[in-house]
From Swiss-Prot:
Its cofactor is Mg(2+). GO terms for molecular function: GTP binding; metal ion binding. The gene is engB. The keyword Nucleotide-binding applies. NCBIfam families: GTPase_YsxC (TIGR03598). Necessary for normal cell division and for the maintenance of normal septation. GO terms for biological process: division septum assembly. This is Probable GTP-binding protein EngB. Pfam families: MMR_HSR1. Disulfide bonds: none annotated. It comes from the Bacteria. InterPro entries: G_ENGB_dom, GTP-bd, GTP-bd_ribosome_bio_YsxC, P-loop_NTPase. Residues 22-194 form the EngB-type G domain. Signal peptide: none annotated.
Length: 214
């Protein structure tokens, strides 16, 4: 996809605040400090469309950005940051669960993992959540420039085993070298296609234990 324009539309915490209209949505999710902001900024050719907070866990809203006239890019709160107050964490779960389980515009979620880190329980729970709601995941492994080829292979094996993923489901990315940018866009474009829209349905199944978001 050639990105000509990207603009912030609004923030939301509940369905009444979501943007109106029928534009399809691709959401981005991952732990705090996993490189989500850098990934989004590289994809849309912007330096600071999505800003990295100086304090992990500060992002508490679902943020909607319109890309061209084609789709909404949705920035979800990061999860897994231990210092966020418990009361705030409890507010985030229903917000996230409602969006992922009920939002009809949602076509898929880019689930972001750090190549240097073993997937956490929150990562496993997020993937289980997406599967339970029949939301297609795009798994993107970030910060690949920070490890050797051998370490990438070792960590990939760990990720595939823990998350029950196949090799072809992993998409490697580096914000520094732009490795993987085209591949990630290809995955997104596939989910935005009319054929994908006909097969993507939001399930009403009960949610598994969900990650607490930061």
């Amino acid at each position: 996809m050639i990105v000509k324009q990207t603009e912030f539309i609004k923030s939301a915490t509940k369905p009444a605040h979501y943007p109106e209209g029928n534009l399809p949505e691709i959401a981005f999710a991952g732990r705090s400090n996993v490189g989500k902001s850098s990934l989004v900024n590289v994809l849309v050719n912007r330096k600071n469309l999505v800003r990295t907070s100086s304090t992990p866990g500060r992002t508490q809203l679902i943020n909607f950005f319109q890309v061209n006239d084609d789709f909404m890019l949705v920035d979800l709160p990061g999860y897994g940051y231990a210092k966020v107050p418990l009361a705030v964490k409890k507010e985030w779960r229903p917000m996230m669960e409602t969006y992922l389980s009920k939002r009809r515009n949602l076509r898929g979620v880019v689930l972001i993992l750090d190549i240097r880190r073993t997937p956490t329980e929150e990562d496993l729970q997020m993937l289980a959540w997406l599967r339970a709601f029949s939301v297609p995941p795009i798994v993107v492994i970030t910060k690949c420039d920070k490890v050797s080829k051998n370490e990438r292979a070792r960590q990939s094996a760990v990720i595939m085993e823990k998350m029950q993923l196949k090799k072809e489901e992993l998409n490697y990315f580096s914000a520094l070298s732009k490795e993987g940018k085209d591949a990630v866009w290809a995955r997104i474009d596939a989910l935005l296609s009319p054929a994908a829209a006909e097969t993507t349905e939001i399930s009403g199944d009960p949610a598994p234990s969900a990650p607490v978001n930061d």
